[in-house]
Swiss-Prot record:
One of the protein's GO biological processes: translation
Primary residence: mitochondrion
GO CC, alphabetical: mitochondrial inner membrane; mitochondrial large ribosomal subunit; mitochondrion
Additional record remark: Present with 1800 molecules/cell in log phase SD medium.
Positions of region (Disordered): 40-63
Protein name listed in UniProt: Large ribosomal subunit protein uL22m
Biological classification of the source: Eukaryota, Fungi, Dikarya, Ascomycota, Saccharomycotina
Transit peptide: 1-25
Native species: Saccharomyces cerevisiae (strain ATCC 204508 / S288c)
Gene Ontology molecular function terms on file: structural constituent of ribosome
Gene: MRPL22
Family under the similarity heading: Belongs to the universal ribosomal protein uL22 family.
Biased composition regions of type Basic and acidic residues, renumbered to the chain: 48-59
Source superkingdom: Eukaryota
Subunit text: Component of the mitochondrial large ribosomal subunit (mt-LSU). Mature yeast 74S mitochondrial ribosomes consist of a small (37S) and a large (54S) subunit. The 37S small subunit contains a 15S ribosomal RNA (15S mt-rRNA) and 34 different proteins. The 54S large subunit contains a 21S rRNA (21S mt-rRNA) and 46 different proteins. uL22m forms the wall of the exit tunnel.
Length: 309
């Protein structure tokens, strides 16, 4: 009884080994047999008729296995591209991606104001010589209504033509950059660029490139370089400062930080912003009361009956 049981188990092990080898062999043979039979499970029993509008050669060439075979058999190599010939200017895909990320190149009055407010604002500026004046009554040509536009000081600054420019990451410190930027604040753009060209500061070259970039952006908006001046210019930390160990005597160490900064500026026009600021300063001076040596104030305290001199 035990002998027959052992013999049956031995036969079962042999059959499983044979079946597993056959199944593995059949799995490997299946794709080849299907490819030879044109993809039919019945092999040569049925005929694989070509589809209408396509040739047999087109189907074979379009199959994945044939495409791999053609690619492996092809002796021609892809043409090599010279990396030095690719620049930022001639890379069309990169330029399209940069343009898609940027905001549209237009003045703030065209993008922030509604059509009616834009007409009133432009009419107000046209009446007052190019800049906005408070409490000005405006009458549009196609309407009999009269309008008065009220804007805050912040809104007036935003709507006036201006150019915002920012630099790249600069290897310098805020203390060194401030010495140069204080000199350039309030100057005309062209004069500021000349000052940067003749300055011995290392950061002057990056600041000059920033101002030239702002001039180009202003020309796209229709602003003349001779009419631009630096309204605001400042610097700040760009973050991610590099640090390294400073080894000292007697096993002491320190940490040296390498600062990185950025420079940003706002360019405005002399024909609009400076004229408005001069007009507001003139109004403020006219409203100021005249200075007198002894003001007309009530007498405080007890005077007494004795004359005082």
């Amino acid at each position: 009884m035990n002998f027959h049981t052992a013999r049956i188990s031995q036969v079962g092990v042999i059959s499983r080994a044979l079946l597993s080898s056959v199944s593995r062999r059949w799995i490997h043979v299946t794709p080849i047999s299907l490819n030879n039979s044109g993809g039919s499970l019945f092999g040569s029993i049925t005929e694989n008729k070509p589809k209408e509008g396509k040739n047999r050669g087109d189907e074979d060439a379009g199959s994945f296995s044939n495409r791999l075979a053609i690619a492996s058999d092809s002796s021609g190599e892809a043409p090599e591209v010279n990396r030095d010939s690719i620049t930022i200017e001639n890379d069309k895909l990169l330029q399209q991606h940069i343009i898609s990320l940027q905001q549209p190149e237009q003045l703030a009055s065209q993008s922030l104001l509604s059509p009616l407010k834009r007409e009133i604002y432009e009419a107000n500026c046209k009446i007052n010589g190019g800049f906005y004046k408070k409490d000005t009554i405006v009458k549009l040509p196609n309407s009999s209504e009269r309008y008065k536009l009220k804007l805050t000081k912040r809104e007036i600054e935003v709507l006036e033509p201006s150019v915002y420019a920012q630099s790249y990451r600069i290897k310098s410190s805020m203390k060194k950059a401030t010495l140069l930027l204080r000199l350039l604040g309030g100057l005309d753009v062209m004069k500021a660029i000349s000052q940067c060209h003749f300055s011995n500061k290392k950061i002057a070259r990056e600041v000059a490139e920033l101002l030239q970039k702002g001039v180009k952006d202003g020309q796209k908006l229709g602003l003349k370089p001779e009419d631009l001046y630096i309204s605001q210019i400042w610097t700040g930390s760009d973050g991610f400062w590099r640090k390294r160990v400073e080894f000292k005597a007697r096993t002491r160490i320190g940490i040296i930080s390498h600062p990185y900064i950025h420079v940003r500026c706002i360019l405005r026009t002399k024909s609009v912003t400076k004229r408005r600021l001069a007009y507001e300063a003139h109004l403020k001076e006219q409203k100021r009361a005249p200075w007198v040596q002894l003001g007309d104030k009530p007498i405080r305290g007890v005077t007494g009956g004795v004359y005082k001199w």
